Amino acid sequence: NILSYSIKHRNERRMYIYPTDQAPYWGSGRFPIGKFMNQETTAMMGSVGVACKLSHSVMYLKMKRVERGRYEMTFIPICMDASKTTPEEIMRKYYDLLEEEIRETPENWLWSHNRWKW
């Protein structure tokens, strides 16, 4: 359980990387976050809820393809203290950054994958 692990290690410097999905699996808790790529979209809020409870910083990881098999990664701050905002605001900002990245480099997006299965 990530929450109990995070609480146990809250005084240690750690980085947690949480995946997210536009089609959360059944039973994970689906929360509407508005439009993403012109589609009504839901998101999993568990990990961002942990960040809010523990006052974590939240970053977006932007990946830029430099050449075949080589990428540059840049952390873009979404918020420095998640307890000062809401999970919905954090996820909205995340999806805004993701959509911006997709529009900048559409060739890196897997267009054949159905991302809205609900």
Give the ranges of each region predicted by the language model:
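Non-catalytic C-terminal accessory region of glycerolipid acyltransferases
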Residues: 2-118
